[in-house]
Amino acid sequence: MSDHKEAKSFSRFGYIMVAAGAAIGLGNIWKFPYLAYGDGGGAFVLIYIVICILLGHPIVQAEQAVGRRGRASAAASYGVIHPKWRFVGVINIVCTFLIDIYYLVVSGWVLKYFVTYVVSGDFGKDKQAYFDNYISSTTQPLIYSLIIIAIIVFFLFFGITNIVEKASKVIMPMLAVLLLVCGIYALIVVPGAVDGLKYYFVPDFSKFGMQQFADACMQVCFSVGIGWGIFTTLGASMNKDANLKADAWWVDICDTFIALLAGFVIIPTVVGTGSEMSSGPSLVFVAMTQIFETLPGGRIIGIFFFASLIFAVISTFFTILEIPRMYVQEKTHTSHQVSLIITATLVYGGSVLCSLSKGILSWLKLPWPSFQGIAYYDIYDWCDCLSGYVLLPLGVLLTCFYIVKAWGFNEYEKELTNNGKHGKLSMYDKLSLAVICPVLTLIVILHVFGFI
């Protein structure tokens, strides 16, 4: 059994900061702006916010309730209420483990760029070539990823409640301030940044279709952190008197605010300088280094920007590494420290394969079946697709079925509202879990396999 049962419960502010920190990460700062730019700007932002309300919020509530009721790991918490549905939590854990693996690779890239800015700020004349050469190299990416995982293990070695809550109370406000300062500075000094701001906030539905809608649904799962087991795990440490409904809203608001801030920094800057966003990695590691080079004080801005990414990485890893760790502890009956070392070793081992798949293992391709045929991806991209476009929405879909069929609305309402102390389960809440959320997640799953 997890040591969460004996763990001191989070304070309300501490929980909100920890939960927001777990949800906020590279998905918000790296992936959200790229998708918003390519999927219609303001149109994507508007649909994203709507889906966050329709899909993100109900599932955050549900996962928190499952975790607080179970007081254990994601898998065990689902099993406490109904043993036959334990597999839902296992799917969450497998998904998070895969995300941990490739997330660690990207985190190492972030640390490399931060260190380079601090030391020299020199990325050569061809920023794309610099990036490509670095990620395809063998030794350096592995070293930087090892440094990241070592930092995370060092902090978590002393316990999630004591370390994570204190760190998140500092990291999350600091991240918001860093992004806000960078965004305001860009609007002041970048010619044409106002046009980028208009593109970002004024909807253009001419570029919006099924692909963009599926992207928005997937991004809500990835960005808010639903389907990972994040809120089930953190819910295990929530006070029994906590207002789950209100806390879920605060987590949603904090997450969306940081995502919008990231777009506020990046999109006006890129549009104003005439740069192109061709992919997620190119956005942060190529386009932004090109942009910072042209700005007064660009090296300082680069240091602060990549520092904010490191804060996001650390705050996210504090929780997403804990999710598989708790499962390992339950299965191996080892201590917190031993299970942490085992989990971190497995994650780093997987990240080595992902990193090398961009270089010396680039020849190794894994099959990806779809209605349109079979595609082949390297290990990194395969883990990304499986976790983001299949396991995340599948986890959300099964959570809906679990609440509706296994737990039942009556028992769910008792846990969610503290037996009516914090309101009641509305007809809309029931409709969300029974119809709206399942339909939205099915759209993503069917789309990724080429059916729609």
Which stretches of residues belong to each language-model region?
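Membrane-interface "cap" regions at the ends of multi-pass membrane proteins
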Residues: 1-30, 59-64, 68-80, 86-87, ...
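Extracellular loop-to-transmembrane helix junctions
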Residues: 7, 36-62, 141, 258, ...
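Transmembrane helix-boundary motif of multi-pass solute transporters/channels
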Residues: 13-51, 230, 235, 245-249, ...
